[in-house]
Every structure is written in C-alpha cells, then in structure tokens.
From Swiss-Prot:
Start-end of Acidic residues biased regions: 176-185, 474-492
Annotated Polar residues bias: 42-52
Sequence ranges assigned to domain R3H in this UniProt record: 594-656
Name assigned to this protein: Protein SQS1
Taxonomic source organism: Saccharomyces cerevisiae (strain ATCC 204508 / S288c) (Baker's yeast)
Biological role stated in the UniProt entry: May be involved in splicing since overexpression antagonizes the suppression of splicing defects by SPP382 mutants.
GO molecular function, a single term: nucleic acid binding
Biased composition (Basic residues): 1-17
Chief place of localization: cytoplasm
Region described as Disordered: 1-60, 176-200, 466-493
Cysteine-cysteine disulfides: none
Gene: SQS1
Cross-referenced SUPFAM superfamilies: R3H domain
C-alpha cells in the first residue's frame, strides 16, 4: 500500500491547500481579497486574563477605585472563576478556582498575583453556630412538657375532688405558658418549679384509697360446670412379648402382667425340689433301656453317688427313674454314671421370680451370671421381607473371599446393562440390593449368607465307620471282656456286613467291566456342512451315507426349523433390548444409530423437568453438534464438547438462568424446520437400517431379445372374449379371412417384424 503524504492527514480544513484558513499556503495573512488583517491588542485589565486575579479571590471589589474597569462582570468570567473554561476538570488550576477568601489582607498584591494552586488555604472557626432548628426543637419540647403537666393536674383534681385547687393550678400553668413565649431560655426551670409546688400541696393521706365496702361474691349458680373424663393412655411397649424366654439352651415359659410392667417366670417346682427340664426325657430313656435289657443281663451294679440325701430329679415317674438308676451299672461304671447324669443348673433356681423389661430392675438373688437370650437370625427366605426382591434377577456364579469384603462374579441386566458376567465389589452389590430392589437392611446379611451357602456347600463330618476296631465272632474273647467292653462289641456287631447283602456283587462288577470300553468311547464331532446363505441355506449330506429320500427331507426340515428358531430367538432378544433401551436415560443406548430433531427437543423438555444436572448426547457430525448447542442456548443452558474425532459429543448443563428463564420456543421452532435427521458417526449402521434411511433407486427389469427373432411370435390368438373380435364377427368376418369388402380384402397373413441388433445392413436374401 502506498504511503500517504502528510497533507492528507488531519482535517481537510486545517491542511487544505488554497483555502481561506489562516495556515493555508501562500497569503495566509491575507483575507479573501489578499489584504492584511489587523489584530486588536487585548487590554491588560481584561476579565479573560488568568494572570490578573479577580478581586483577590473575591467578587466584592467590583466598584473599587483602583480597578474602575470592572463595573460589569460577564457570565463567561463568572464561569471561568467557578468552573474554568480552558482548564481540564481535574487539573491543579481547577483545584484553585474555588470560591472563598484565601487571604486575610487584600493589600498584598504580589501574593494576589500568584497562581491559585500556590496560594495557601486557611480554615477559620465560626464564632456562632447557625442552627435555626435548635430553637424550634426547644420550643416544641417545652410545649409538650406543659401539656403533660396539665393532664397530671386534671387527674389529681378528679380523684381528690378539689376543683378550686385545680383551677388555680391551671391558671398558674397558663401564666407560665405566657412567660415561656416571651423568654424561651427560662421555660424549663419555671415548669419544674410549678410541678414541684403542686406535688407539695397534696397530703399523704390523700394518696391512698380505702375501699370501705367489701366486694360482693359472684353468683356461682350461673356458672356452668363441665365434667371432663380423663382418658387413660395405653401403656406403650417397645418390644413384642414372647411367651418363651431362651437363656442359653434352656427355654422358660413366662407370663406378662396386665397392669404392672413385670414378667413372671413359671417354674414348676413340686415339694421344694430342684426341677430339671430334661428329667422326663431321661427317665423315659432309662426306663426303655431297663425293659429291653432286663431279660439278658445277669450283672447288676449299684450306682455310687456322692449325694444320696435328695434325688436329682422330680417327675411323675419317680419310681421308674430310681429303678432305672439301678440298672445303669450294667453298662457303665460309677464314674461314667456321674458324667451321664446332668447336674442341676445353678441358673434355674427359685430366686427367678420376676424379670423386668424396663432395664432398671435387676435380678434378685445370685443371678448375675445369667446369659442373655440368643437372638438367632432366620435364614433368607423365611420372612415376608425376603420376597421383595426376585433372586432370579441376580445370577451369582462365583465368589472371591476377602479379608474385609468379598467380590461376586454375577450377571444382572438392571445393574450392569448387559447379560455378561462381571466381577463387582460387595459394596456395589449391597447398595443395588437395598436402594434399587428395596431389600431391608436387616435382611442383607442373611441374603449374603444365602449366596455364600449356595456356592460353598457345608462340609458335614463323616460318620465313623470303626474300621480300625477289630471285630471277632468267637465267644471266648467275649467272655474275657468286662461289662463295658462286652456291650461295645455287641453294638459293633450290628455294623458287620451280612453275607446276604454281598450276593450278586461279583456279577455286577463283571457287567461293569464288560461295558467299560463302550461307556468311555469317544466320538468325533464336527459342525454341520451347509451350502447357501440366508433363507436358501441347506444341509449338505454326504452321499456315502446312502440315506433314503424321506430321511433327507426330514433332516432338511429339521435344519431349516433350527435356523428359524435361532432367528426368532435372536430377533426376540434384540426387540427386548431395544424396548429396555427406549426407557433408559442413557442416550447412547436409547438412540443406537441416530435421532430426529423432534427427539432432541423431547430430550431437552424431559431434561428440563428432571432433577439431573447433566445430559450427554450421542456423537454427531459437526453440524449436528452445532445444532444441539444452539438449542441448548435457547433453553438457557450451558453446552460444551467432549471427546475427539468421531467420538465428539455435546454435554448440556443446567445453570441458574435455566430455572428462572423460559425457553425461546420461536427460535427453537426455526431450528426444527431445518435439518430433520442426525445420524451417529461413531457406529456403522447395518444394511437394514441404512436402507430405511437412504433412498434407493428402483431398478427396472431389462428384456433381452435375440437377433432375427420375430416380434410377437409366441403371442396367443385373440379370443372370443375380445369385444373387437366379436364386432368383426357380427359384420361377417371369419377366422383366416382378410379385412374388407368382397373384391377388396386385405392380406390374410400379417407382416412379421424381425429383431435386428447388429449393424450389417438388411442383406438381401436370395429367397
């Protein structure tokens, strides 16, 4: 670009050539006709000269003798004095151009000629304070005090019934008011003096009022009485009453009082003897042992007990118990008998009379060592709360035991979004089961134990086989044993395998060994051989099998049925997944291939009504992402891009303006009338979906003809159903005749047209 000369810069009037301006070219000192212009000199006492002070900073010397030229002050001078015309608003010169007396003496002309910013500023304290409202406030205050004193005097006059005194006080106060109007400074002392004088005139006896007539009692018959019945509040019990109290392995039957908050224990004591809950059971067992062994036993041993003063148990069959005790010695010695008989429990004494549920009352007697009732948790499936969830939704196939938490290898569509197995932590599983499925938290440990027990079976201890104990059938060895070993050998003899059980065992082993080779025989397997694709897919069968036609048709029908079943299952699975994805909040699953502009608006409307803060759209092309961002702007939302390349998507977030502002639907409707369909760029569409969205050209069928072929050679003859043939037959035409009148008929054979595709010409034929 060419450089411009200096005479083009600035305003045209200042740098123009040959103009009438003072700085223009030649003859700038001349006017229009070239004559010189004479300038008038400015006087020294001009009001516009800033070096001459304007009355030493004051406007009072307008008519002074030493400056007779200032008889008139122009408005521009006043403006220059107060505001300054040629100076900047915040300059130091403007700081000095302020009204006020800057010097005490106006005779110092040398100081007066100094610049305003160099003159010192002095502050003078005023001798008197000009406050016109102060006097007005004092007058109003005095008037208020006068009115208050008048009201006090009038009240005292009504009580003591002294009208003469009241009038004198009022007159005195009125006189004081007149004096206050003359002299405001003496108002308050005079008023205080009048009030003090009035108070001194009142006697002490008149200050009290004595009621000589007693107050009459009211008539109580006129007062209505209402009887309100007190409703007894029911006693609230924080726990449920259980008629059976479990302490360790002992169960006690308890009963609840009606009015008291105590629970009594029913102890069936008879004759002040110790009660044992298993006394009846033990007596029945011992009685059965006595009846079965009384015929064969010859040895009778007595029981040596340490305490023979009182029996250990008390029951209805006490005689049978004693009789059973005498026969126990046939099987065990005295030391074993002492271990067999249970000692009386120190916990079940007569001192257990009442149990308190308030937590304040303690047990009476020596019952401090009572164990608390064991609260055994029910297994999963024994409560109604367990049926809130469906255990088929969560399929657990493996578990990893950890020090703190476990990991589970499970499959759950609602949790993971697919039908594959994944490893998840125990915290994630518990949150999903409690929050999503609604299982109570107190049943969560039972559910986890149920999963663990279903995967890890309990190992039960094996039953003893006594294989290490020698067993002999001889009677000599049996006589040498003592009573206790004799009984043990007799019990072990029952476990010996009888000979009749072993019958046929050899035949079974021989049969198993005979068919052992066929049982473990392996067959070669391979996939079926097919030909064709899609619906034309057929089973390829080897001819060496020599199968008949009926068998081949059966195999083909079964194979086609198998393919159709697989296709139906696949289609049903895809339809189910699509139906689940349509109700999902994840737009990547909801729109697998693309979305319409109406879908975008519906998603924005749904997002506006939900409590979510973020909404992620599927990856679209750049124009689609730009359209989504424009719609988000019209909905008063914030939009941003995430991802790279084909995975660039738009994330929309709510802001404060979204809640308080309404969307601009007019601009949104304009965007909806533009591009309708937006396809995803991160997923390739299948052929079926691609054919549905793209327009395909209809291909017409092409007819191929051969060289020399007669056109319409194989065309059928026109039948009698044709209306044209019927008209000709009515006119006298017959099949094989030409058209026309007699003597002027046309040809009977039609002219044949042959197809010619090559460029060799007509080629005259010799025939």
């Amino acid at each position: 670009m060419a450089k411009r000369h200096s005479h083009y810069q600035g305003s045209r009037r200042r740098h123009a050539r040959g103009s009438n301006s003072k700085k223009a070219g030649r003859g700038n000192a001349k006017g229009i006709q070239g004559r010189k212009i004479k300038k008038k000199p400015t006087p020294t006492n001009s009001w516009h000269n800033s070096s001459i002070p304007l009355g030493e900073g004051d406007l009072d010397d307008v008519g002074a003798d030493f400056n007779p030229g200032r008889a008139f002050i122009s408005p521009k001078t006043i403006e220059d004095y107060y505001f300054g015309r040629d100076a900047k608003s915040r300059s130091m010169k403007m700081g000095g151009l302020r009204p006020g007396n800057r010097y005490d003496s106006s005779t110092d002309l040398q100081a007066g000629r100094a610049a305003f910013r160099k003159r010192p500023m002095q502050f003078v304290k005023a001798k008197e304070v000009y406050d016109p409202s102060h006097n007005m406030i004092q007058k109003l205050r005095a008037k208020n005090e006068t009115k208050n004193s008048e009201e006090i005097v009038e009240r005292e006059a009504d009580v003591f019934e002294e009208p003469g005194k009241m009038t004198s006080d009022v007159e005195y106060i009125n006189n004081e008011d007149s004096e206050n109007e003359d002299d405001d400074s003496q108002n308050s002392p005079s008023t205080d003096h009048s009030l003090s004088s009035n108070e001194s005139k009142v006697e002490d006896g008149d200050l009290f009022f004595v009621d000589e007539e007693a107050q009459q009692s009211p008539d109580l018959t006129k007062i209505k009485r209402v009887c309100i019945e007190e409703i007894a509040r029911p006693r609230e019990v924080a726990i449920e009453f259980d008629p059976i109290l479990t302490i360790g392995k002992v169960e006690l039957s308890v009963s609840e009082g009606n009015e008291s908050k105590e629970i009594s224990v029913d102890v069936p004591n008879k004759g002040n003897k110790t009660y044992h809950p298993f006394a009846g059971y033990i007596s029945n067992v011992l009685h059965g042992m006595h009846t079965s062994d009384s015929d064969n036993d010859e040895l009778d041993y007595e029981i040596e007990t340490e305490n023979n003063s009182e029996p250990l148990y008390e029951s209805s069959a006490s005689s049978e118990v004693d009789q059973g005790f005498n026969y126990v010695g046939q099987r065990h010695n005295s030391r074993a008998d002492n271990n067999l008989l249970p000692s009386p429990s120190p916990q079940l004494t007569e001192d257990i009379k009442c149990l308190s549920i308030n937590g304040t009352k303690t047990f009476e007697g020596n019952n401090d060592n009572l164990p608390s009732p064991a609260s055994e948790e029910l297994e999963f499936g024994f409560k109604e709360e367990d049926f809130v969830i469906n255990t088929n939704d969560i399929v657990v196939s493996n578990i990893r035991m950890g020090g703190v938490d476990n990991s589970y290898y499970l499959r759950c569509y609602r949790l993971l979004g697919d039908y594959d197995f994944h490893w998840i932590d125990q915290d994630l599983l518990t949150d999903f089961v409690v929050d999503e499925l609604g299982l109570p938290e107190d049943r969560l440990p039972a559910y986890l134990n149920f999963i663990k027990n279903s995967l890890i079976p309990k190992i039960e201890p094996a039953e003893p086989t006594y294989s290490d104990i020698p067993i002999s059938d001889s009677s000599d060895e049996g006589d040498s044993y003592e009573g206790d070993s004799y009984e043990d050998d007799e019990d072990m003899a029952s476990s010996v395998v009888h000979s009749d059980i072993e019958e046929g065992l050899d035949d079974l082993i021989a049969y198993t060994l005979k068919h052992d080779t066929e049982r473990f025989k392996t067959f070669e397997t391979k996939s079926l051989e097919t030909k064709g694709k899609g619906k034309k897919k057929k089973l390829l069968i080897d001819d060496a099998l020599a199968l008949d036609t009926e068998t081949l048709e059966t195999l083909q029908s079964k194979f086609s049925k198998r393919i159709e079943t697989k296709a139906k299952k696949r289609k049903a699975k895809e339809d189910f997944i699509d139906q689940e994805n349509r109700n999902s909040n994840d737009m990547l699953k909801k729109y697998p291939y693309g979305l319409h502009i109406q879908n975008i608006k519906d998603e924005f409307e749904s997002f506006l009504s939900r409590n979510n803060d973020r909404l992620t759209f599927p990856p679209l092309d750049p124009h689609g992402n730009k359209t989504v961002m424009k719609i988000a702007k019209h909905y008063n939302m914030k939009s941003s891009k995430i991802g790279k390349a084909n995975h660039t998507s738009v994330v929309v977030e709510k802001i404060k303006k979204t809640k308080w502002s309404s969307p601009n639907y007019s601009l949104i409707d304009q965007l909806m009338r533009q591009r309708p369909v937006f396809m995803r760029i991160d997923i390739r569409r299948p052929r079926e979906e691609q054919a549905a969205f793209e327009r395909t050209k209809t291909i017409r069928g092409k007819f191929h003809v051969k060289e020399g072929e007669i056109v319409g050679q194989n065309a059928p003859e026109i039948g009698n159903e044709n209306i044209g043939r019927r008209m000709l037959e009515k006119l006298g035409w017959k099949s094989g005749e030409g058209l026309g009148i007699q003597g002027n008929k046309g040809i009977s054979e039609p002219i044949f047209a042959k197809i010619k595709k090559n460029r060799s010409g007509l080629r005259h034929s010799e025939s």
